[in-house]
């Protein structure tokens, strides 16, 4: 479990101290006596919420909000990306729960497939090849269970309001059934096929992978210029010593070379087309063919086609009906096609072949070269292209349909819809869903040993394992042969995790009605799919495909895409860079609520740097909230007063401003604009309520004006706690219980709504500016905040708030005026934007600076005339000084001028 001890202690001295005047406080014990100790309080509430089932889903509720949460792979410990992503999801869940929705907020573990196998091998220091399949699967289950238990504790310690009764595992029997049902349904629809064809292959994991599981990796290698003997040109036999040059980074593919290609616009090499060439070292003769896919700008412009080096090789092989020469096997070992290099790993064979080419005189040049290769995203091993038999889901014939399905969903942010569409537009392969691994969900198929016909499991049997379960028939339905061989492959993990909306909704086959049904149909389509932008092509696209094919509907109404967590230098975190920051280290130093404040610090979709300063800002907000709450608690009676028939102007104004904040923050939550909601709420609470209104309230209560102020303090305080609750669940729950002694959790109370208060907001805001200006005046002049001021003049609109300002700042005489005072404005300087001025005027910048220094310039409207040139308003800013010539000291706010006399 993540540790709950903090090296930072919350120092309460930087916010309002509770009043010492006992006449203004209740005689009962202080509900907030002492300091806030998150080290003790946060774990207590985490345990209490789970014990009380505070976040349980209510199937009988009238309104609901369903979230299709991403099941993390069980491949290690919690990282900052998890913390960030889970917290964003939790903001949504907590907000909707308080909006009177019952929230379906499940948690899943994607614990089948390659990630689980590699974790098991790493943890136990074993290889899956060294164990019988069943035994290795059991080891995977044991290791995954251990990590899942630890992971669950870690997620709970982040205050994520998961309903833990709705937890699923993708390897569990009920999920296996859903996955196998999906396979059978798509097969019956004609959307699946089995084919022996070129496949993207990971030699390290020894399995086929899909296009989506590849990623680019920069690699430093050698570009080798190799001489091929020309046997014939397109016009007849070639000269005895005629050669041409092929440039390649992969000479180990020479034994797999089956053709040479020239671009039809390559005039210099057109004479080769129709002829043939001999491959050095391996001596096979291959044809020279014209094809427009040749890149004339790379290397010599003449390209060898090998089976297979890349996607182009596959396309040429298919388009020109070329022979098949497989020189590399499933473990990246050279085959007998490679002759004397058989048994070597490809990297070893590459060096040996280069050396032999050099000795033979066929290696013309070998030079350094940086290029991009395709690697498996799980292990970063460079992929190969092998011919294997695999199961596929058809995608390419419905690309436009899947794009249109994406347009039926609301995207937050909108720009991520474009990324989804671009991925589909760039698809070149159908989805390979079979994997040659030990741990995974079995493909429910047997094959006839005679005719090869696939025999599908019956729906009632599922889940099945063909390796241990009997087939549904005794003989092949196609030819009658009585020998059936079980499928050994398992599903790609994404073939199962793409079904999470159906898993959570309880999708199943009903034999009585002979149709698919859902146990919780009210959940589907889900209201929200939250996830990172890095798995749009993995999880989101595949979920749309599967659910759309099974139900005819898109699986969710809204999609919320978050960015990645970067380090403080805005670089991606990685073990190789040594810049990974474990959440455990962060939570040893800071409260959980402070990390949640940090997580709300950027717009969704944007990559997000980890900055310790943001956590410190969150910690300061906790201090401010605790101290302000303690002050409110001591200023107000134990029993909440009824709303008076008439509120004082300043109280009505505060509640009207709070109404506007409630409406604005609510709208931002609805649009998933958490950073804007957080910043607006913090600003109003800190600057307006704490710094301005509380000072006024203290003074008004000391003057005996209690009822209106007490009601306003409590109304505002309760509202602030509820608005902060999704961001800061621990401290708001603690304050709610201590201050209001209510039985229910703050997180199940109703979200605040507008109280319908009406006030002159402009006048009130200006009055608060005046209070701030006078407080600043006292501080700058070394005066205590309760020092008396004899005479203050305010030039600005504060009608109705004069008494509040005078009382709060101890002003004996306060005069207000609508018109501005006599102020002289002079230009004190010109500030140039050199990023624009430099490129535009070059060597003339020096003369421009000198003329400005001498005051030799003229401002004409929005332009600056100086040194014989004209600068537009984007290139400069005018600096002004303002001087008050009357009696007293002037200070200005955004909306008023204040003079202390």
UniProtKB/Swiss-Prot annotation:
Biased composition (Acidic residues): 19-35
'KMSKS' region (motif): residue ranges: 572-576
Residues of the signal peptide: none
Example of a GO biological process term: valyl-tRNA aminoacylation
InterPro entries per record: aa-tRNA-synth_I_CS, aa-tRNA-synth_Ia, Anticodon_Ia_Val, M/V/L/I-tRNA-synth_anticd-bd, Rossmann-like_a/b/a_fold, tRNAsynth_Ia_anticodon-bd, Val/Leu/Ile-tRNA-synth_edit, Valine-tRNA_ligase_type_2
Reactions the enzyme catalyzes: tRNA(Val) + L-valine + ATP = L-valyl-tRNA(Val) + AMP + diphosphate
GO terms for cellular component: cytosol
The UniProt record lists the keyword Cytoplasm: yes
Residues at which ATP binds: 575
Enzyme class, spelled out: ligase
PANTHER family: VALINE--TRNA LIGASE, CHLOROPLASTIC_MITOCHONDRIAL 2 (PTHR11946:SF93), VALYL-TRNA SYNTHETASES (PTHR11946)
Entry similarity comment: Belongs to the class-I aminoacyl-tRNA synthetase family. ValS type 2 subfamily.
HAMAP family: Val_tRNA_synth_type2
Domain commentary: ValRS has two distinct active sites: one for aminoacylation and one for editing. The misactivated threonine is translocated from the active site to the editing site.
Function as written in the Swiss-Prot or TrEMBL entry: Catalyzes the attachment of valine to tRNA(Val). As ValRS can inadvertently accommodate and process structurally similar amino acids such as threonine, to avoid such errors, it has a 'posttransfer' editing activity that hydrolyzes mischarged Thr-tRNA(Val) in a tRNA-dependent manner.
Stated name of the protein: Valine--tRNA ligase
Gene that encodes the chain: valS
């Amino acid at each position: 479990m993540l540790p709950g001890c903090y090296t930072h202690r919350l120092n309460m001295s930087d916010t309002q101290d509770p009043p010492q005047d006992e006449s203004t406080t209740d005689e009962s014990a202080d509900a907030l006596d002492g300091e806030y100790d998150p080290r003790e309080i946060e774990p207590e509430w985490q345990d209490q919420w789970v014990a009380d089932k505070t976040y349980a889903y209510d199937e009988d509720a009238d309104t609901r909000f369903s979230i299709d949460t991403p099941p993390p792979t069980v491949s290690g410990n919690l990282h900052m990306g998890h913390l960030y992503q889970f917290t964003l999801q939790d903001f949504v869940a907590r907000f909707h729960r308080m909006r009177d929705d019952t929230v379906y907020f499940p948690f899943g573990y994607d614990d089948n497939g390659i990630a689980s196998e590699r974790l098991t091998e790493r943890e136990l220091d074993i290889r899956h090849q060294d164990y019988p399949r069943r035994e290795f699967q059991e080891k995977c289950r044991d290791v995954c269970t251990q990590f899942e238990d630890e992971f669950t504790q870690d997620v709970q310690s982040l205050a994520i309001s998961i309903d833990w009764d709705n937890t699923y595992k993708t390897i569990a029997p009920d999920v296996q059934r859903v996955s196998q049902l999906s396979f059978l349904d798509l097969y019956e629809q004609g959307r699946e096929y089995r084919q022996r064809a070129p496949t993207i292959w990971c030699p390290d994991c020894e399995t086929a992978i899909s296009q989506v599981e590849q990623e680019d990796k920069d690699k430093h290698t050698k570009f080798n210029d190799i001489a091929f003997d020309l046997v014939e040109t397109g016009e007849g036999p070639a000269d005895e010593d005629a050669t041409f040059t092929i440039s390649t980074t992969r000479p180990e593919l020479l034994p797999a070379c089956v053709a040479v290609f020239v671009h039809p616009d390559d005039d210099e090499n057109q004479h080769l087309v129709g002829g043939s060439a001999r491959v050095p070292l391996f001596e096979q003769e291959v044809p020279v063919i014209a094809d427009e896919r040749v890149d004339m700008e790379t290397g010599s412009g003449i390209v060898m086609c090998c089976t297979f080096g890349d996607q182009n090789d596959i396309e040429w092989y298919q388009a020109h009906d070329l022979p098949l020469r497989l020189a590399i096997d499933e473990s990246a070992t050279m085959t007998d096609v490679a002759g004397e290099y058989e048994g070597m790993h490809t990297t070893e064979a590459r060096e040996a072949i280069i050396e032999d080419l050099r000795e033979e005189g066929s290696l013309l040049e070998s030079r350094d070269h940086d290029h991009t290769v395709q690697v498996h995203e799980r292990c970063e091993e460079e992929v190969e292209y092998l011919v294997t038999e695999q199961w596929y889901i058809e995608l390419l014939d419905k690309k436009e349909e899947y794009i249109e399905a994406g347009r039926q969903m609301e995207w937050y942010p909108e720009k991520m819809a474009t990324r989804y569409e671009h991925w589909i537009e760039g698809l070149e392969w159908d989805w390979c869903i079979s994997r040659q691994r030990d741990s995974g969900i079995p493909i429910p198929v047997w094959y006839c040993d005679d005719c090869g016909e696939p025999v599908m499991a019956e729906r009632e049997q599922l889940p099945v394992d063909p390796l241990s379960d009997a087939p549904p028939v005794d003989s092949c339905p196609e030819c009658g042969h009585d020998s059936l061989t079980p499928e050994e492959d398992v599903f790609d993990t994404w073939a199962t995790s793409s079904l999470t909306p159906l898993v959570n909704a309880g999708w199943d086959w009903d034999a009585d009605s002979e149709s698919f049904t859902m146990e919780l149909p009210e959940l589907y389509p889900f209201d929200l799919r939250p996830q990172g932008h890095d798995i749009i092509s993995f999880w989101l696209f595949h979920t749309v495909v599967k659910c759309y094919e099974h139900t005819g509907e898109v699986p969710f109404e809204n999609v919320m895409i978050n960015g990645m967590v970067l380090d403080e230098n805005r670089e991606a975190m990685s073990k190789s860079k040594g810049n990974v920051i474990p959440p455990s280290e962060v939570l040893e130093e800071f409260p959980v609520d402070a990390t949640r404040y940090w997580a709300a610090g950027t717009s969704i979709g944007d990559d997000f740097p980890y900055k310790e300063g943001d956590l410190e800002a969150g910690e300061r907000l906790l201090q401010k909230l605790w101290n302000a709450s303690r002050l409110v608690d001591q200023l107000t009676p134990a029993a909440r007063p009824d709303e008076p028939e008439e509120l004082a102007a300043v109280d009505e104004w505060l509640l009207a401003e709070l109404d506007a904040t409630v409406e604005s923050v609510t709208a931002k939550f609805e649009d998933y604009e958490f950073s804007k909601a957080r910043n607006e709420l913090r600003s109003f609470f800190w600057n307006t309520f704490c710094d301005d209104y509380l000072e006024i309230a203290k003074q008004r209560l000391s003057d005996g004006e209690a009822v209106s102020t007490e009601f306003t303090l409590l109304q505002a305080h309760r509202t602030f706690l509820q608005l902060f609750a999704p961001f800061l669940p621990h401290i708001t729950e603690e304050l709610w219980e201590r201050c209001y002694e209510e039985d229910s959790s703050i997180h199940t109370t109703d979200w605040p709504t507008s109280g319908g208060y009406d006030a002159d907001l402009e006048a009130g805001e200006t009055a608060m500016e005046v209070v701030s200006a006078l407080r600043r005046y006292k501080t700058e002049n070394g005066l205590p905040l309760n020092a008396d001021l004899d005479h203050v003049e305010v030039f600005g609109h504060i009608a109705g708030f004069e008494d509040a300002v005078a009382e709060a700042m101890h002003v004996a005489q306060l005069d207000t005026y609508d018109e501005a005072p006599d102020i002289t404005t002079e230009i004190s300087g010109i500030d140039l934007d050199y990023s624009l001025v430099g490129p535009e005027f070059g060597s003339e910048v020096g003369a421009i600076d000198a003329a400005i220094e001498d005051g030799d310039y003229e401002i004409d409207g929005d332009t600056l005339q100086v040194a014989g040139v004209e600068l537009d308003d984007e290139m400069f800013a005018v600096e002004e000084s303002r001087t008050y010539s009357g009696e007293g000291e002037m200070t200005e706010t955004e909306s008023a001028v204040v003079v202390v006399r």
